[in-house]
Amino acid sequence: NFDYVVGLALHEGSHIAYSDFNAFAEVRNLSKVREFDLDHQKMEFFRGVINYIEDRRVDGIVFRGSPGYKGYYHSLYNKYFNSKKVANGLSSEMYREIDLESYMFRIINFTNEATDFGALPRLLDIYKLINMKNIKRLKSTDDAIELSKSVCEIVWSMVDSVKGNGEGDNENSENGENKESEGSSDGGGNGTEVD
């Protein structure tokens, strides 16, 4: 399928027009985000969240300004985010541990209909904070970075609290149930609109 390749080229090319690469460079020099010291893992997670949010911001600009490209973007999203393979991963018992890898997998796949907001604590809060349907409110790369800081603040607090309490893997509470998120454990994710 050629369409997703065109979609990927359009997506990457749109960063040249709409992303501020100086802002990305400044992020690389940070040693702290809000009250969190940045070790290598936190920095990589932070950069991943920035990339995800900036991608959605830029895609939103192109969607609104060039509706003729929508089909290519739909092919791109269907290939990488809305595939059955990703849906199977979201529905499985994988990526349910309170760690950075699990949060990243769940966040970057919010567009998939198999999204399960009950998979991790505060996942629904993160989804609402990103507010994909109103992504156009982000006017710049700096706005995407600030939103990413807020997302990371939630995730790092959750991950650090588990590390600090010495809880075992995949334990979200005393009885293994997720008490922190308002999402249902049976899925409940309708995905988010790309356009």
Model-predicted segments: where are they?
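Short, functionally important secondary-structure microenvironments
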Residues: 1-195
